[in-house]
């Protein structure tokens, strides 16, 4: 014996296999608890479908409505929700330990913009040559970045050395 394929979405009309349902008519008015046969008749009279809205309730809540229109509205809601989602990107700002004040300000302005857009920022501090002898300068600079953006960003990944570079990740608050 083969089981019928499982449909996604709510059960409609004859697919509803419970003896009694709580019916809501097409105007949104509660009609009360009734046998499934009476609910199906009421839906047929209205020329609409009987759709199971809350299957887990006792008795299940069914509503008389146009199923095609209902599916369309649900799809529209899903699409709207998808549009509103913001994908958080990881932007990278590269610095050097002996960066000039103006250059730092330019980088800080970019970081500010990234945080306003809701993106995370990876601050990478590259050491070259003899700069490796003074990692404390790099740590000092990253702590300055951390302090400057303390109000609008939180540290997600504390500053630490990875090879010839020091990395810190900040996320908007």
Curated annotation (Swiss-Prot):
Protein biosynthesis is among the record's keywords: yes
A GO molecular-function descriptor: translation initiation factor activity
Lineage: superkingdom: Bacteria
Alphabetized UniProt keyword annotations: Cytoplasm, Initiation factor, Protein biosynthesis
Cellular compartment(s): Cytoplasm
GO BP annotations, alphabetical order: ribosome disassembly
Primary subcellular site in the record, as a coarse category: cytoplasm
This protein's GO CC annotations: cytosol; membrane
Family statement: Belongs to the IF-3 family.
Job of this protein: IF-3 binds to the 30S ribosomal subunit and shifts the equilibrium between 70S ribosomes and their 50S and 30S subunits in favor of the free subunits, thus enhancing the availability of 30S subunits on which protein synthesis initiation begins.
HAMAP family per record: IF_3 (MF_00080)
Assembly and oligomerization: Monomer.
Name of the protein in question: Translation initiation factor IF-3
């Amino acid at each position: 014996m083969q089981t019928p394929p499982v449909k996604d979405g709510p059960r409609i009309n004859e697919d509803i296999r419970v003896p009694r349902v709580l019916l809501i008519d097409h105007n949104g008015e509660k009609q009360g608890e009734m046998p499934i046969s009476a609910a199906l008749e009421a839906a047929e009279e209205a020329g609409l479908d009987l759709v199971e809205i809350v299957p887990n309730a006792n008795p299940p809540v069914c509503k008389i409505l146009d199923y095609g229109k209902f599916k369309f509205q649900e799809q529209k809601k899903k699409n709207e929700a998808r549009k509103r989602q913001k994908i958080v990107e990881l932007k990278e700002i590269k610095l050097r330990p002996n960066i000039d004040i103006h250059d730092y300000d330019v980088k800080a302005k970019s970081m500010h913009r990234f945080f306003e857009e809701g993106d995370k920022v990876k601050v990478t501090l590259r050491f070259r040559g003899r700069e490796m002898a003074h990692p404390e300068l790099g740590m000092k600079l990253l702590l300055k970045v951390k302090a400057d953006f303390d109000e609008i960003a939180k540290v997600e990944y504390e500053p630490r050395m990875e090879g010839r570079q020091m990395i810190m990740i900040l996320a908007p608050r």
